[in-house]
């Protein structure tokens, strides 16, 4: 089988105007970026508001492993399959970050014959949205220090500046820095640090904003510091929001591309689900729903992270509700959850599969807590055996009363996911609730919201909140932010805060190390265990295998 990039490069792509025509977008509403990528004009997006919305399909997964689950691949394959069976489907994805592309994960445009293309452009600079978000965030950082330098009229306490800097790269050396060294002309030295762009509150605001006006209003609510008498300082106080909105104006228009089979795909925004809320932009999701009968979207990492935040943050803020949920699993990953090392995953092991099944079972149970119909997509690998597939399907049927469907979209494209597509249509047309069940009520205390997630979804005995975090939570409550939802930042590899504790651990304690207010986005970030908002590169980063060949073509971007 050729590599992903070889498959993508061999494809004959349709002009982006032809893709737009399929979903009723006129040429005049497109801002082309070359022949195969375009942004959709703000005015056209606004003109769609009166149109009825289609059905929303959420794709999530089991807890990820190094064996890979293929959630984006399945999202693309399902969208292609829905179009193949006569449904009008639009795929809605997040934009990849450069950090993971050059780090451990590699590209994030799907795989095999279920990809969005042009994959090199999508995985790298794309339309410059991340540059715009990084620039807007950096402008805010510069304005804060500039305000202090020129007299500090707002009385900002430089010890309590919460606004860190960002860059779209995995770079552990930037986690903690000292800035403004070199003399008085460079400002007031203080401790600072960098996060990755996808963890920026600007990214979260970008993805949750309804339109340009809402974007600017949300930017203005962002709290960046405190005064010496402990009053909040916002970006509106610093008069930063107008210039930031100008930087983000064009970026806020969703990006239209295509799959290998010519299905329309909107790729827009890209917060991680382990350190942010993990969903593509509200604007793109709503646009997909108004342009198609079905909008197929994904939420990052496992259902304990991305799906929970999709429901408790994105749906709570917007009124969206999935008509069906797909949980992606692989036999390989389940066997790894059952204790098998990666090098042995190609060998049949029914006992390990049965042991690792508990991870899938908990994710299914958690999705059902949201009150949503669910189906399991078994992303097929060539090493899977019929006995293993039969075992998993029987476990799902007998223990969970859920259908598990073998999907071969990686090798066969949309044709390999038609059975899944028909099952999704049956679930969606069966009638899902207009509002999902949220994990916690809005008026619960912030600490109780964290505890409820930990005990209900993670199987934890309790939470342990460090004193610094407890003090900040109490202050957030006092300042009127107690009704905000919480955004859990923790390892994606486990229900616990220990990435090595696989399967479905119970009775553990979730350690809350810190909390951060995201008043503009409308949630409180809860930093658990050793999770970092600036990742580092692995010992052998993917960047080492990426290069240009003699003809100037990119190689190694898998």
Swiss-Prot record:
Pathway linked to the protein: One-carbon metabolism; tetrahydrofolate interconversion
Similarity comment: family membership: Belongs to the formate--tetrahydrofolate ligase family.
Species this protein is from: Methylobacterium nodulans (strain LMG 21967 / CNCM I-2342 / ORS 2060)
Keyword NADP: no
Domain of life: Bacteria
The protein, known as: Formate--tetrahydrofolate ligase
The EC number(s) this enzyme carries: 6.3.4.3
Record GO terms (molecular function): ATP binding; formate-tetrahydrofolate ligase activity
Residues annotated to bind ATP: 65-72
Record field: catalytic activity: (6S)-5,6,7,8-tetrahydrofolate + formate + ATP = (6R)-10-formyltetrahydrofolate + ADP + phosphate
GO process terms (BP): tetrahydrofolate interconversion
Keywords recorded for this protein, A-Z: ATP-binding, Ligase, Nucleotide-binding, One-carbon metabolism
Broad class of enzyme this protein falls into: ligase
């Amino acid at each position: 089988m050729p590599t992903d990039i070889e498959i993508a490069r061999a494809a004959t792509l349709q002009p982006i105007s032809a893709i737009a025509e399929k979903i009723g977008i006129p040429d005049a509403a497109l801002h082309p970026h070359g022949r195969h990528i375009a942004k959709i004009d703000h005015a056209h997006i606004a003109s769609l508001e009166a149109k009825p919305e289609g059905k929303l399909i959420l794709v999530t997964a089991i807890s990820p492993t190094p064996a890979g689950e293929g959630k984006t691949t399945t999202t693309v394959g399902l969208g292609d399959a829905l179009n193949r069976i006569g449904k009008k489907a639009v795929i809605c994805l997040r934009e990849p970050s450069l950090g993971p592309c050059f780090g451990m994960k590699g590209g994030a445009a799907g795989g095999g014959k279920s990809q969005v293309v042009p994959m090199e452009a999508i995985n790298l600079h794309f339309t410059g949205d991340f540059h715009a978000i990084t620039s807007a965030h950096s402008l805010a950082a510069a304005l804060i220090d500039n305000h202090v330098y020129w007299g500090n009229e707002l009385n900002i306490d430089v010890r309590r500046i919460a606004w860190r800097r960002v860059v779209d790269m995995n770079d552990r050396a930037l986690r903690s820095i000292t800035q403004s060294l070199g003399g008085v002309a460079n400002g007031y030295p203080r401790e600072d640090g960098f996060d990755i762009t996808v963890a920026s509150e600007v990214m979260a605001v970008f993805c949750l904003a309804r339109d340009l006006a809402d974007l600017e209003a949300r930017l203005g609510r962002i709290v960046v510091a405190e005064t010496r008498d402990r009053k909040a300082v916002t970006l509106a106080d610093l008069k930063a929001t107008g210039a930031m909105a100008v930087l983000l104006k064009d970026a806020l228009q969703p990006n239209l591309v295509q799959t290998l089979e010519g299905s329309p795909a909107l790729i827009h925004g890209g917060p991680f689900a382990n350190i942010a809320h993990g969903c593509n932009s509200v604007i793109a999701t709503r646009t997909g729903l108004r342009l198609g009968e079905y909008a197929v979207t994904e939420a990052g990492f496992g259902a304990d992270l991305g799906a929970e935040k999709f429901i408790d943050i994105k749906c709570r803020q917007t009124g969206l509700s999935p008509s069906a949920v797909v949980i992606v699993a692989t036999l390989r990953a389940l066997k790894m959850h059952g204790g098998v090392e990666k090098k042995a995953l190609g060998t049949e092991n029914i006992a390990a599969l049965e042991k690792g099944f508990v991870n899938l079972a908990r994710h299914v149970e958690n999705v059902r807590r949201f009150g949503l119909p669910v189906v399991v997509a078994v992303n097929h690998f060539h090493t899977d055996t019929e006995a293993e597939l039969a075992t998993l399907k029987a476990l799902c049927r007998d223990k969970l009363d859920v259908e598990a469907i073998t999907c071969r979209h990686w090798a066969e494209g949309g044709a390999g996911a038609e059975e899944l597509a028909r099952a999704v249509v049956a679930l969606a047309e069966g009638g899902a609730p207009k509002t999902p069940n949220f994990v916690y009520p809005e008026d619960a205390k912030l600490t109780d919201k964290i505890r409820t997630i930990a005990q209900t979804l993670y199987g934890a005995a309790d939470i342990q909140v460090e004193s610094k975090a407890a003090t900040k939570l109490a202050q957030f409550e006092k300042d009127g932010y107690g009704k905000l939802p919480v955004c859990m930042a923790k390892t994606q590899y486990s229900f616990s805060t220990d990435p090595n504790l696989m399967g479905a651990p119970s009775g553990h304690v979730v350690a809350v190390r810190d909390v951060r207010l995201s008043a503009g986005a409308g949630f409180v970030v809860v930093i658990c265990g050793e999770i970092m908002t600036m990742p580092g590169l692995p010992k052998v980063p993917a960047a080492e295998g990426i290069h240009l060949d003699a003809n100037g073509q990119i190689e190694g971007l898998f």
